[in-house]
């Protein structure tokens, strides 16, 4: 009887571990706005660690926010963010908005639902490009599990209101550049 219980416990533990397996993928996005067309819905649902290179825009960030329910780690350190203007970006309620190049879009990983800002709860770590100029309004607001934001830029990008609000996030910057971040507005 004990052997049977032990076997059942072992099988349950093994199936639980399999269900939470890390799924890492790397994609080169040649045309901004086409990330989601490069994979199936099942793939997007299972990815936990995603590395993107190539060209992204606000449409891609909306898909990252809304259609990758298991995403924990995002590396866009070798991606370029292109300009986008339109209603299919990250701004709440489908408002027309102009997203500038190499800016982490406003509401990139948060959304306003019923007047309340909700962040991407699964996101734990993000690695940003050295080309990043701005982290826009509420980009990571409400991402309560975001523990690490690694920025490869030696000079601090502009940090707009509530960009990192509601999260206790460790910011990792290149060696010798901590003063650039420490003395820049909103980075204190």
Where on the chain are the PLM-derived regions?
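Bacterial Sec-dependent N-terminal signal peptides
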Residues: 1-24
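Well-ordered, non-membrane alpha-helical segments in soluble/globular domains
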Residues: 60-62, 100-107
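Accessory end-domains appended to solenoid repeat scaffolds used in host defense
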Residues: 38, 46, 57-62
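Extracellular/surface-exposed low-complexity segments
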Residues: 3, 168-188
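Structural signature of tandem-repeat unit edges
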Residues: 23-31, 48-56, 71-86, 91-103, ...
């Amino acid at each position: 009887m004990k052997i049977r219980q032990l076997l059942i416990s072992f099988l349950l533990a093994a199936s639980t571990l399999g269900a939470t397996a890390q799924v890492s993928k790397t994609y080169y996005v040649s045309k901004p706005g086409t990330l989601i067309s490069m994979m199936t819905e099942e793939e997007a649902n299972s990815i936990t660690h995603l590395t993107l290179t190539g060209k992204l825009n606000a449409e891609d960030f909306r898909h990252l926010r809304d259609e990758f329910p298991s995403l924990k780690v995002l590396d866009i350190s070798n991606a370029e963010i292109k300009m986008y203007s339109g209603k299919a970006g990250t701004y709440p309620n489908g408002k027309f908005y102009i997203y500038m190049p190499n800016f982490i879009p406003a509401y990139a990983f948060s959304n306003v639902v019923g007047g309340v800002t909700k962040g991407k709860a699964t996101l734990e770590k993000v690695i940003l490009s050295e080309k990043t100029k701005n982290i826009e309004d509420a980009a990571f607001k409400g991402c309560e599990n975001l523990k690490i934001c690694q920025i490869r830029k030696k000079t601090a990008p502009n940090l707009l209101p509530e960009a990192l609000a509601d999260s206790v996030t460790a910011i990792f910057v290149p060696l010798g550049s901590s003063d650039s971040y420490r003395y820049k507005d909103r980075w204190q």
